[in-house]
Curated annotation (Swiss-Prot):
Record's GO cellular component terms: cytoplasm
Family statement: Belongs to the universal stress protein A family.
Superkingdom of this protein's organism: Bacteria
Cellular compartments annotated: Cytoplasm
InterPro entries on file: Rossmann-like_a/b/a_fold (IPR014729), Universal_stress_UspA (IPR006015), UspA (IPR006016)
One GO BP annotation of this record: response to stress
Protein name: Universal stress protein C
Pfam families the record matches: Usp
NCBIfam families on file: PRK10116.1
Organism (species): Salmonella typhimurium (strain LT2 / SGSC1412 / ATCC 700720)
Main location: cytoplasm
Function of the protein: Required for resistance to DNA-damaging agents.
UniProt KW keywords: Cytoplasm
Length: 142
């Protein structure tokens, strides 16, 4: 089966390179589109700053996430169609992107650390509700 648009759920971690490499290995032979989705870090989870500082911190973290996605795409040696930075429930965003952008394969990491354990839970939700194929990739780095 050939896919036409692959959505890769990544995090601002080195393991994301493995996920994108898997996507590129599937996409390149059939010239499929590859897009990336990640969760925005919420500074409220990590800090107890005053409200005005939170907005500044959110902006900085959003910019760092954008820079990471850009760098990830550059290192992939394959064009990235779109990037999405989601907040809230990742699985809902993945399902919405699949519908709106005609994604036919979602790739998620299977990992036990913070983001990826949340993404893995999201992957279970995506698998149960998805109308498209979902590939769970085992990640090194424990």
């Amino acid at each position: 089966m050939s896919y036409t648009h692959i959505l890769v759920a990544v995090a601002v971690t080195p393991e994301s390179h493995q996920l994108l490499a898997k996507a590129v290995s599937i996409a390149r032979p059939v010239q499929a589109k590859v897009s990336l989705i990640t969760l925005a870090s919420d500074p409220e989870l990590y800090n107890q700053f005053a409200a005005p500082m939170m907005e500044d911190l959110r902006a900085v973290m959003h910019e760092e996430t954008e820079n990471f996605l850009k760098m990830l795409g550059e290192k992939a040696d394959y064009p990235i169609e779109q990037t999405f930075i989601a907040s809230g429930e990742l699985s809902q965003h993945i399902l919405a992107v699949c519908r709106k952008h005609h994604v036919d394969l979602v790739i998620c990491g299977n990992h036990n650390h913070s983001f990826f354990s949340r993404a893995s839970c999201s992957a279970k939700s995506v698998v149960s509700a998805s109308q498209v194929d979902v590939l769970l990739v085992p990640l090194a780095g424990d």
